[in-house]
UniProtKB/Swiss-Prot annotation:
UniProt catalytic activity: Hydrolyzes the peptide bond -P2-(S-farnesyl or geranylgeranyl)C-P1'-P2'-P3'-COOH where P1' and P2' are amino acids with aliphatic side chains and P3' is any C-terminal residue
Binding of Zn(2+), residues: 284, 288, 362
InterPro entries documented for this protein: CAXX_Prtase_1, Peptidase_M48, Peptidase_M48_N
Name of the top EC class for this enzyme: hydrolase
Originating organism: Arabidopsis thaliana
Protein name, UniProt field: CAAX prenyl protease 1 homolog
EC number: 3.4.24.84
Membrane topology value: Multi-pass membrane protein
Summary of the function given for this chain in its UniProt record: Proteolytically removes the C-terminal three residues of farnesylated proteins. The substrate specificity is only partially overlapping with that of FACE2.
Length: 424
């Protein structure tokens, strides 16, 4: 008797939807609380709290609708055999274009073109509502409809340019990989990730935002002095025009080896009260570098990728698995898609584990900045970022433990105060 793989996958998807909806309902209850957490009383104004509460509730209601539609669509696609039907139709198109339907690479690219078109059509109403209703209502959206369409066109163009050679390479590797397939797949994706990490900030990100050098002045001098004191190989210091699309703020760093760069959102510079608060945020980011968090995270991702490819090689020739999902043939891409569905339970556990590690890293980076003497500036900087981004002030502990990669503000402030007392 054949194992009902597809029915099991759909069943687990529904179970996870119910579980995550339960967590969402708990978070909704927390968001409806009319008062600030005790730690934030007197720190955040009632006006900002009310705005944050309204924004968080709007996003929460939107999330309920989006997730309900998503689980309906995903379950229907699997349960009613739409995936194999779509694969068959994408192959039938090729002869009309004078192309060989037996060529798996061409068939796969035709399939992906259809999937991408379908995804854009189904995602568009949600993206438009999120950007031009919710984000606009709460003063974040700065995009025009033309900018939105232009970004979508640019994203599609990049997919068309970068997607085919990557897909072709993966199919070729799977077809020729033999017993060392997992190693070859991992090596290819490892090299690809390094290439993308190199070209994204230089070639891709500038297509969507303008990056300009931070002007000479006290702020630049303080950041360079901090970087130098930590022996951080800072080569370039940029300001990105995030305000052209949103008033959300952030800062990040990137680069390999001796070629590191720091990027500040112009909104971060505008929102912080003084330069020392901005430097405190950078001290936190440099803490991630000094404590090797980026390296550890990258290694963890590579290990997980290798394990996934190893698992894929064990099931890629399983006729029963493909037939359970409605396929008589065993295309490479379809095998990868099916495998991703069958390991959904493990993916949820891994995601939860990575969030735990990420939150621990955030506490460590905060403590690093405090030890450098930035406690009095980091604290108000985090509060300001929370206020200006209208992030949720009240959070359910189970919800945040499961979903959040960063600790809630209340926990971070409490930890900063505790670390600051140790250094006194």
């Amino acid at each position: 008797m054949a194992i009902p793989f597809m029915e099991t996958v759909v069943g687990f998807m529904i179970v996870m939807y119910i579980f995550e909806t339960y967590l969402d309902l708990r978070q909704l209850t927390a968001l409806k609380l009319p008062t600030l957490p005790k730690t934030l009383v007197g720190v955040i104004s009632q006006e900002k709290f009310e705005k944050s509460r309204a924004y968080s509730l709007d996003k929460s209601y939107f999330h309920f609708v989006h997730e309900f539609v998503t689980i309906l669509m995903d379950s229907a696609i699997l349960f009613f055999g739409i995936l194999p039907w779509f694969w068959k139709m994408s192959g039938a198109v090729l002869p009309r274009l004078g192309l060989d339907p037996e060529n798996e690479i061409l068939h796969t690219l035709s399939f992906l073109a259809g999937v991408m078109t379908w995804s854009q059509i189904t995602d568009l109403p949600f993206s438009l509502y999120s950007t031009f209703v919710i984000e606009s209502r709460h003063g974040f959206n700065k995009q025009t409809i033309w900018m939105f369409i232009r970004d979508m066109i640019k994203g599609t163009f990049l997919s068309v340019i970068l997607g085919p050679p990557i897909v072709a390479a993966i199919i070729f590797i799977v077809q020729k990989g033999g017993p060392y397939l997992a190693i070859y797949l991992w090596a290819f994706m490892f090299i690809l990730s390094l290439v993308m990490m190199t070209i994204y900030p230089v070639l891709i990100a500038p297509l969507f935002n303008k990056f300009t050098p931070l002007p000479d002045g006290d702020l630049r001098e303080k950041i360079e002095k901090l970087a130098s004191s930590l022996k951080f190989p800072l080569k370039k210091l940029f300001v990105v025009d995030g305000s052209t699309r949103s008033s959300h703020s952030n800062a990040y760093m990137y680069g390999f080896f001796k070629n590191k760069r720091i990027v500040l959102y112009d909104t971060l510079i505008q929102q912080c009260k003084n330069e020392d608060e901005i430097v405190a945020v950078i001290a936190h980011e440099l803490g991630h570098w000094k404590l090797n968090h980026t390296t550890y995270s990258f290694i963890a991702v590579q290990i997980l990728a290798f394990l996934q490819f190893g698992g894929y090689t064990l099931v890629r020739n399983s006729t029963d698995l493909f037939r359970s999902f409605g396929f008589d043939t065993q295309p490479v891409l379809i095998g990868l898609i099916i495998f991703q569905h069958t390991v959904i339970p493990l993916q949820h556990l891994v995601s939860f584990g990575l969030n735990l590690v990420s939150r621990a890293f955030e506490f460590q980076a905060d403590a690093f900045a405090v030890k450098l003497g930035y406690a009095k500036d980091l604290r108000p900087a985090l509060v300001k970022l929370q206020e200006e981004n209208l992030s949720a002030m009240n959070t359910d502990p189970l919800y945040s433990a499961y979903h959040y990669s960063h600790p809630p503000l209340v926990e971070r402030l409490r930890a900063i105060d505790g670390e600051d007392k140790k250094t006194d």
